[in-house]
Amino acid sequence: METFLFTSESVNEGHPDKLCDQVSDAVLDACLAQDPESKVACETCTKTNMVMVFGEITTKAEVDYEKIVRDTCRSIGFTSDDVGLDADKCKVLVNIEQQSPDIAQGVHGHLTKRPEEIGAGDQGHMFGYATDETPELMPLSHVLATKLGARLTEVRKNGACAWLRPDGKTQVTVEYYNDNGAMVPVRVHTVLISTQHDETVSNDEIAADLKEHVIKPVIPEKYLDEKTIFHLNPSGRFVIGGPHGDAGLTGRKIIIDTYGGWGAHGGGAFSGKDPTKVDRSGAYIVRQAAKSIVANGLARRAIVQVSYAIGVPEPLSVFVDTYGTGKIPDKEILKIVKETFDFRPGMMSINLDLKRGGNGRFQKTAAYGHFGRDDPDFTWEVVKPLKWEKIPA
């Protein structure tokens, strides 16, 4: 049996880039909670002792940007300079303007258009992917890397590993074989965890705790064997972290946000963007389409692409590839997808209920992945029934 190795990585909510994603989405949540028609393009950057939010926002909402920044940093665990940032003392810079009136009239017709007439907020192409290798219909390498990161945060916050600090990265290499286009995981080849820690803990303690409290609960035993390689804080020391260690910026972790290097990516980031931005809503609907193809048994693995022109409601193209795993030809599946899903931006917002704020909905997406999560707020993970006829054997 010929196998190959594939690797996916993840970063924790305390990673500077992810801190920025969460601030941008917390701002979006605050705007949508008061005004579902808010137009938001919010970027965040951070470095030692400073967080800046900037961009274009048009909203009726009354938003205290500085409070949102501080609350978000605090909830992640940035409560002193020692851990990389002090939410209460850091500088917060705000430079937010209204959306360009040129874009507003071209895309939204200044709110005069019916939903089905609303044009895409920008050009671009987005991909959705699904695979039958996990219950989430997501790639195993990505699922494990993401869950290890989420577990690191859990044991930091519940006190099981009190020496942990907010910043951290994970990476998992999985050995696969290709079953006529479908991906079948055989074993976990390598687990890498680099986590920020306090001064008091030894490398041996770190390794023992990570194995016991993080790796064991996350990686199913059947994937681990005596040959599995563990790199646990391989650089030795990681005390300085968060924005003190590295600068951070919204939209710099787009592969972690999606499929861990599987499938494809159109390049557009998600966080800080309202649903009229097809970078986000387009990527969400094609995930729903790809997931529905696999969940309905039409294929074991699928990728769906959609593309847009600014100001134009109808997509320019929709593409489906099932990597040779389709039960019926891809062109038939494409026809079913186009009949089932409405790819017009105004309709995607309605069908996926994307304008609903509150519940920290989009901030939840901004750490540990936008896809494969079991949460009712992740409406794009709901499988739609697809009508198709099985070809008799």
UniProtKB/Swiss-Prot annotation:
Subcellular locations according to the entry: Cytoplasm
Cofactor entry: Mn(2+); Mg(2+); Co(2+); K(+)
Transmembrane segments: none
Binding site for K(+): E43
Metabolic or biological pathway, per its Swiss-Prot or TrEMBL entry: Amino-acid biosynthesis; S-adenosyl-L-methionine biosynthesis; S-adenosyl-L-methionine from L-methionine: step 1/1
Biological-process GO terms, alphabetical: one-carbon metabolic process; S-adenosylmethionine biosynthetic process
Binding sites annotated in the UniProt record for Mg(2+): E9
Positions of L-methionine binding: E56, Q99, D246, K277
Residues annotated as binding ATP: H15, D167, G168, K169, S235, G236, R237, F238, D246, R252, K253, A269, K273, K277
InterPro entries attached to this UniProt entry: ADOMET_SYNTHASE_CS, S-AdoMet_synt_C, S-AdoMet_synt_central, S-AdoMet_synt_N, S-AdoMet_synthetase, S-AdoMet_synthetase_sfam
Keywords of the record: ATP-binding, Cobalt, Cytoplasm, Magnesium, Metal-binding, Nucleotide-binding, One-carbon metabolism, Potassium, Transferase
MF GO annotations: ATP binding; metal ion binding; methionine adenosyltransferase activity
GO CC annotation, single: cytoplasm
Reported induction: Follow a circadian regulation with higher levels in the light.
Keyword Cytoplasm: yes
Cofactor note: Binds 2 divalent ions per subunit. The metal ions interact primarily with the substrate. Can utilize magnesium, manganese or cobalt (in vitro). Binds 1 potassium ion per subunit. The potassium ion interacts primarily with the substrate.
The EC number(s) this enzyme carries: 2.5.1.6
Described function: Catalyzes the formation of S-adenosylmethionine from methionine and ATP. The reaction comprises two steps that are both catalyzed by the same enzyme: formation of S-adenosylmethionine (AdoMet) and triphosphate, and subsequent hydrolysis of the triphosphate. May be involved in the synthesis of betain in response to abiotic stress such as high salinity.
Subunit structure: Homotetramer.
The protein, known as: S-adenosylmethionine synthase 2
Organism: Beta vulgaris (Sugar beet)
Upper classification of the organism: Eukaryota, Viridiplantae, Streptophyta, Embryophyta, Tracheophyta
